[in-house]
């Protein structure tokens, strides 16, 4: 995707804690990924602006900010030239979905996107 490379490492379920719970019938899907800046200048990474998930009924889910305290690493902030950033992306999704599509759209103007399929049976937890 231009100057940014994306690697999907895996995904895991998170059911919440006493302080944060998904809505009834939902679960948190935490996606482990790396973004690499292949350019010679810094880039700003925004999980809220660059990533979304669609379930098997084509319903979209944005990054679930409420689950952010439970993730390992974040995909947000400045990413220097030639550097990598690894973290988890939290999404609140229907618990009964069998597959998901992760959409990575690094250009805010909509000039290209990468789509990754995640099957429920491949998700840890």
Predicted regions and their residues:
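Short strand-coil-strand connectors
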Residues: 1-2, 56, 105-109
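Membrane engagement elements in two modes
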Residues: 1-12, 22-24, 96-97, 115-125
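Hydrophobic core residues within well-ordered beta-strands of beta-rich domains
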Residues: 4, 29-31, 85
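Short, solvent-exposed beta-strand/turn "edge" segments of beta-rich domains on protein surfaces
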Residues: 12-30, 41, 78-80
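Surface-exposed coil/turn segments at beta-strand junctions on protein surfaces, enriched
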Residues: 24, 80-84, 93-95
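Beta-strand cores of secreted/periplasmic/IMS beta-sandwich domains, seen most often
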Residues: 28-41, 89-91
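The feature marks short-to-medium sequence segments in extracytoplasmic or secretory-pathway proteins
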Residues: 36-85, 112-124
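Short, surface-exposed ligand- or partner-binding patches at beta-edge/loop junctions that are enriched
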Residues: 86-117
